[in-house]
Design a protein with these regions (language model features):
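A short C-terminal helix-loop "cap" of Rossmann-like NAD(P)-dependent dehydrogenase/epimerase domains
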Residues: 1-3, 91-95, 120-123, 147-158, ...
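N-terminal Rossmann-like NAD(P)+-binding domain of SDR-like oxidoreductases, especially those catalyzing
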Residues: 1-132, 245, 249, 261, ...
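Conserved mid-core alpha-helix of short-chain dehydrogenase/reductase
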Residues: 17, 58-63, 168, 173-180
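Glycine/proline-rich active-site loop of Rossmann-fold NAD(P)-dependent oxidoreductases
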Residues: 107, 132-145, 152-159, 163, ...
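Hydrophobic alpha-helix immediately C-terminal to the catalytic Tyr-X-X-X-Lys motif of short-chain
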Residues: 108, 112, 116, 146, ...
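Hydrophobic "lid"/C-terminal helical patch
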Residues: 150, 178-182, 206-209, 236, ...
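Conserved C-terminal active-site "lid" loop/helix of NAD(P)H-dependent oxidoreductases
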Residues: 171, 191, 203, 222-250, ...
């Protein structure tokens, strides 16, 4: 770590640790990325998701309030749109039909952030991320899982008929959006979508990974999973107008970039993702 970086490892539900992390520091802003993530595991361990994503966010907001930190960025999720059938998803669309514990906790996090923003004048931006991918991404996500399994000549799980679609967003574009949000001086509380603004079906994604690896996938066909949205698609017009956000890396470019990184990472003997 450099002289301007101090790393504190711990649990955001630990109020004492948060007090220590904020003690004597006049932070310009807090970017809250800490969370338990993933729709499917949230069905198996909803208690852990409620603890981290709701109680943890509450405790962090308390620490921000006590420290007088003027600005907060909260990483939310496209999953809050739930059963919304209108495409693309707009920040003005209904968000009262979440279909997973994970989505419910992210929506609760947004509401907590709104409350603290208005009560304590913490300028807050909630960013709804759409399926972020790229180097060092979570190993349970489709792109990293498919890359590893196809590369190792193992079957990949394919849920449903392959028509489900996601708006995949390369991590570099997400970072650009976060940096822009840190400089945003709009309302005391606001919400933006950050996505790639294009949809890719599961079948198309598998084909992209196959092409990047130069290998065909062996398919383990499985039924659709409850809680998974059939399609996500970000309307990023608001972020474009007010943040200058413009996703630059389409999925056809991003998947090969990720696969190349993965192969180089494995060649260094790193093992896993």
């Amino acid at each position: 770590a450099g002289q301007n970086l101090h790393v504190v490892e711990g649990d955001i539900c630990d109020a004492a640790l948060l007090d220590k992390a904020f003690h004597g520091c006049n932070y310009d802003a807090v970017v809250h990325l800490a969370a338990r993530v993933g729709v499917r595991p949230s069905r198996e361990h909803p208690d852990l998701y409620l603890r981290t994503n709701i109680d943890g966010t509450f405790r962090l907001l308390e620490a921000v309030k006590k420290a007088g930190t003027p600005r907060l960025i909260f990483a939310s999720s496209s999953s809050v749109y739930g059963l919304n059938k209108k495409l693309p998803f707009s920040e003005l669309d209904r968000i009262d039909q979440t279909i997973s514990p994970y989505a419910a906790t992210k929506l609760a996090g947004e509401q907590l952030c709104s409350t603290y923003a208005h009560l304590y004048s913490i300028r807050t931006v909630c960013l709804r991320f759409f399926t972020v991918y790229g180097p060092r991404q979570r190993p349970d996500l489709a792109i990293s899982k498919f890359t590893r399994l196809i590369n190792e000549d193992q079957p990949i799980p394919k849920f449903g008929d392959g028509s489900s679609a996601r708006d995949y967003t390369y991590v570099d574009d997400i970072i650009e959006g976060i940096v822009a949000a840190l400089a945003y001086d709009g309302p005391i509380f606001d919400v933006f979508n950050l996505g790639g603004s294009q949809t890719t079906t599961l079948a198309e994604l598998i084909a992209l990974v196959e092409k990047a690896l130069g290998k065909r996938a062996e398919i383990n066909q499985l039924p659709e999973q409850p809680g998974d949205l059939p399609r996500t698609y970000a309307d990023v017009a608001k972020a474009g107008e007010l943040l200058g956000y413009s996703p630059a890396i389409p999925i056809a470019e991003g998947v090969p970039k990720y696969v190349n990184w993965y192969l180089e990472y494995m060649a260094m003997g790193a093992g896993g993702n």
